[in-house]
Amino acid sequence: MQAKRVESIREVDFSGLKVPFVAVYGHPDDFPDKYVARIYELDRATDTIMVKETLEEIEMDIKEHTAMTFIPRGTADVPSLVGVWM
Protein backbone atom coordinates (compact mmCIF):
# COMPACT_ATOMS: atom_id res chain seq x y z
CA MET A 1 0.00 0.00 0.00
CA GLN A 2 1.42 3.39 -1.02
CA ALA A 3 1.40 5.78 1.93
CA LYS A 4 -0.39 9.11 1.68
CA ARG A 5 1.72 11.61 3.62
CA VAL A 6 0.09 14.65 5.16
CA GLU A 7 1.81 17.63 6.75
CA SER A 8 -0.90 18.11 9.38
CA ILE A 9 -3.64 16.02 10.94
CA ARG A 10 -6.10 18.71 9.79
CA GLU A 11 -5.64 17.33 6.24
CA VAL A 12 -7.11 13.97 7.26
CA ASP A 13 -10.79 13.32 6.52
CA PHE A 14 -12.01 11.27 9.48
CA SER A 15 -15.67 11.44 8.38
CA GLY A 16 -15.67 8.03 6.69
CA LEU A 17 -14.00 6.26 9.62
CA LYS A 18 -16.26 4.71 12.26
CA VAL A 19 -13.63 4.39 15.01
CA PRO A 20 -10.54 6.36 13.96
CA PHE A 21 -7.41 6.70 16.01
CA VAL A 22 -3.85 7.89 15.50
CA ALA A 23 -0.99 5.64 16.57
CA VAL A 24 2.26 7.49 17.17
CA TYR A 25 5.58 5.69 16.70
CA GLY A 26 9.08 6.77 17.62
CA HIS A 27 11.76 5.66 15.16
CA PRO A 28 9.82 2.78 13.56
CA ASP A 29 11.64 0.44 11.16
CA ASP A 30 10.34 2.22 8.05
CA PHE A 31 11.33 5.70 9.36
CA PRO A 32 14.22 5.05 11.79
CA ASP A 33 15.13 8.74 12.23
CA LYS A 34 11.58 10.14 12.53
CA TYR A 35 8.33 10.09 14.46
CA VAL A 36 5.30 8.79 12.60
CA ALA A 37 1.57 9.21 13.19
CA ARG A 38 -0.42 6.47 11.43
CA ILE A 39 -4.16 6.78 10.99
CA TYR A 40 -6.14 3.64 11.88
CA GLU A 41 -9.74 2.47 11.52
CA LEU A 42 -10.23 0.11 14.47
CA ASP A 43 -7.37 -2.43 14.11
CA ARG A 44 -6.63 -1.67 10.44
CA ALA A 45 -4.07 0.90 9.30
CA THR A 46 -5.21 3.29 6.59
CA ASP A 47 -2.82 4.59 3.94
CA THR A 48 -2.39 7.95 5.71
CA ILE A 49 0.66 8.95 7.74
CA MET A 50 2.22 12.11 9.13
CA VAL A 51 6.02 12.13 9.52
CA LYS A 52 7.87 14.64 11.72
CA GLU A 53 11.32 15.16 13.20
CA THR A 54 10.12 15.28 16.81
CA LEU A 55 7.41 13.82 19.00
CA GLU A 56 6.50 17.33 20.13
CA GLU A 57 5.62 18.36 16.55
CA ILE A 58 3.19 15.47 16.23
CA GLU A 59 1.66 16.05 19.68
CA MET A 60 1.17 19.77 19.09
CA ASP A 61 -0.47 19.20 15.71
CA ILE A 62 -2.90 16.57 17.02
CA LYS A 63 -3.78 18.68 20.09
CA GLU A 64 -4.38 21.76 17.96
CA HIS A 65 -6.54 20.12 15.30
CA THR A 66 -8.47 17.34 17.07
CA ALA A 67 -10.33 16.65 20.31
CA MET A 68 -8.56 13.30 20.72
CA THR A 69 -7.16 12.03 24.02
CA PHE A 70 -3.75 10.38 24.36
CA ILE A 71 -3.35 6.85 25.74
CA PRO A 72 0.27 5.71 26.38
CA ARG A 73 1.54 2.40 25.01
CA GLY A 74 0.91 -0.75 26.99
CA THR A 75 3.52 -3.31 27.98
CA ALA A 76 2.34 -5.70 25.24
CA ASP A 77 2.62 -3.09 22.45
CA VAL A 78 5.51 -2.88 20.00
CA PRO A 79 8.48 -0.99 21.47
CA SER A 80 8.36 1.81 18.87
CA LEU A 81 4.75 2.71 19.77
CA VAL A 82 4.61 5.86 21.88
CA GLY A 83 0.84 5.73 22.30
CA VAL A 84 -2.51 6.24 20.65
CA TRP A 85 -4.75 9.29 20.22
CA MET A 86 -8.46 8.42 20.30
List the predicted regions and their residue ranges:
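Short N-terminal "domain-start" leader segments
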Residues: Q2-K34, H65, I71-R73
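Local beta-strand/beta-hairpin segments that build beta-sheet-rich folds
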Residues: K4, G16, R44-E53
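A short, structured beta-strand/loop element
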Residues: F31-D47
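A short, charged, amphipathic alpha-helix used as a generic interaction element across diverse proteins
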Residues: I49-I71
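Short, mixed-charge low-complexity intrinsically disordered segments
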Residues: M68-M86
